[in-house]
Amino acid sequence: FDAMRRDLDAQGNAAALDRHQAQALDIITSPRVRDAFDLSREPAHVLARYGHRLGRYPHQTVKTILYDWDARPFIQARRLVEAGVRVVTLRPGDWDHHSAAEGDIFFALRCLMPLIDRSLTALVSDLRDRGLENDVLVVLLGEFGRTPRIAQPGPGREHWADAGCAIFAGGGLRMGQVIGQTDARAERSRTGHITFQNLLATIYRVLGVDPRAQLTDFNGRPQYLLDDP
């Protein structure tokens, strides 16, 4: 970050940035954001709460398959938010369990589910303890669902666009509710479709952005943030 800022200043490229680019540059090169990556500033009991370690979990039969887990991004996400970063994305673990090539899905989830449960719970609880639960929205989701039936050979699960799930916590939203319902096999929606556009509209509103807003692109044409907010 420091080297990037020096290079931009030395070459004069920073002067050519627009308002949004300059704001982004100021954020990622600020001392507060840089310090957010320094986990040595976190007390030991906080690190332990998240399950602070990089773990490698060998497959029970295919010894070359290892499941990695690192709780540090969860802590860094909270620290980045405290430093003023508006949106943070993290990708914990490896959830690509299609077939035996990626390992037995049952073994993999027995490894990974307790780990993400601990780290995600710690993040949500930590934000609440710091009085940030209404200011920060935590979203856990993938880009699609998974086949309701186990795929063979495998065992594993393939991509499934007809139904999926997401977890929302905080952001001033009402907690403790389940929105939507599938059939008994989790194959199809029974209560009408809740689309990714709808999820993005909720996220935009929490960020203070009108999901119905219309912007003008570089060609002077109007563009909507979402087609179906």
Language-model segments: what does each one mean?
Residues 1-229:
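Ligand-binding pockets and gating/stacking loops
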